[in-house]
Curated annotation (Swiss-Prot):
It comes from the Bacteria. The record marks 44, 114 as: Part of a proton relay during catalysis. It catalyses: L-aspartate 4-semialdehyde + pyruvate = (2S,4S)-4-hydroxy-2,3,4,5-tetrahydrodipicolinate + H2O + H(+). This is 4-hydroxy-tetrahydrodipicolinate synthase. The active site is at 140 (proton donor/acceptor), 169 (schiff-base intermediate with substrate). GO terms for molecular function: 4-hydroxy-tetrahydrodipicolinate synthase activity. It comes from Helicobacter pylori (strain J99 / ATCC 700824) (Campylobacter pylori J99). It is an enzyme of class 4 (lyase). Keywords: Amino-acid biosynthesis, Cytoplasm, Diaminopimelate biosynthesis, Lyase, Lysine biosynthesis, Schiff base. Pyruvate binds at residues 45, 210. It is found in: Cytoplasm.
């Protein structure tokens, strides 16, 4: 996986709640021009749980088409880490095959949610999906949403026994897990899935981030990651601290509710629309977001 900084893309909707494909393409191009290495369509932040199978595939397709047709400032191509997660192994497998077929660079697969599989079930789930494709696979551990964690021994076993399982997105909130994973397998790539811990994870064995805040501030997230990769601890910490208030504001309600409203307030999307059961943020949250965006000089 030849990338380090990436954003977990929002999925913009029109007023009728259909996917706004033109806005989606524009958001991806902004990521490209502001220095991100990769984009991550249809993950948690992309509201994948309320997209149809057809919409899910179309979002991956748009991301790949846009990245292939738009050069980065360094004349390279931004990578696509396609979200293929589902609580049904068969559906994830179908999405994984589709993503590979149309040119995804790698796939991100969240643990099955709601059904709460055992560790053996998680192992078989990921093994089955990974063996159906040849491109790299990134595990995604976010127990606060899935109800079950990929325990460290299970993650290590998957890395050791399934050749194309190369990385894990860590959104468990546990630095102990990160240090343990890195201690036992230095080549197992760890990506931060917690914006508030980006700096800490990068300096505890992490090699990159998948950021929600990056939707709004891709340039600063990219700069922080690049500083960390060069072991410029203080410079990376300064950027992390600079982003602290924004990280806090963007998670005051369930993600992606605040980030979509923030993107709207910043003039980056026309409609801050959500599909039920997600709803618009409270008036208090909107005021907080406005104040925070003013603090960062995003809005006047």
């Amino acid at each position: 996986m030849q990338f380090h900084s990436s954003s977990a893309l929002i999925t913009p909707f029109k007023k009728d709640l259909s996917v706004d494909e033109a806005a989606y393409e524009t958001l991806i191009k902004r990521q490209i021009f502001q220095g991100m290495d990769a984009c991550v369509p249809v993950g948690t932040t992309g509201e994948s749980a309320t997209l149809t199978h057809k919409e899910h595939m179309r979002c991956i397709e748009i991301a790949i088409e846009t990245c292939k047709s738009t050069k980065t400032p360094s004349n390279s191509r931004m990578k696509v880490l396609a979200g293929v997660g589902s609580n049904a192994t068969s559906e994830s497998l179908s999405l994984a095959k589709f993503a590979q077929k149309i040119g995804a660079d790698a796939i991100l697969c969240v643990s099955p949610y709601y059904n709460r599989p055992t560790q053996q079930g998680l192992f078989e789930h990921y093994k089955t999906i990974a063996q159906s494709v040849e491109i790299p696979v990134m595990l995604y551990d976010v127990p606060s949403r899935t109800g079950v964690s990929i325990e460290v021994p299970t993650a290590l076993k998957l890395f050791r026994e399934v050749p194309n399982i190369k990385a894990i997105k860590e959104a468990s909130g546990s630095l102990k897990r990160v240090t343990e994973l890195h201690y036992y397998e230095k080549d197992f790539k760890i990506f931060s899935g917690e914006d508030s811990l980006n700096h800490s994870i990068m300096f505890s064995g992490g090699c990159g981030v998948i950021s929600v805040t990056g939707n709004l501030m891709p340039n600063l997230i990219s700069q922080m990651v690049n500083c960390a990769l060069k072991f410029e601890y203080q410079q990376a910490l300064e950027i992390q601290n600079k982003l602290f208030d924004l990280h806090q504001a963007l998670f005051v309600e369930t993600n992606p509710i605040p980030i979509k409203m923030a993107m709207h307030l910043a003039g980056l999307i026309e409609n801050p629309s959500y599909r039920l059961p997600l709803v618009a943020p409270s008036k208090e949250t909107i005021k907080l977001l406005e104040k925070t965006l003013q603090q960062y000089e995003v809005i006047a």
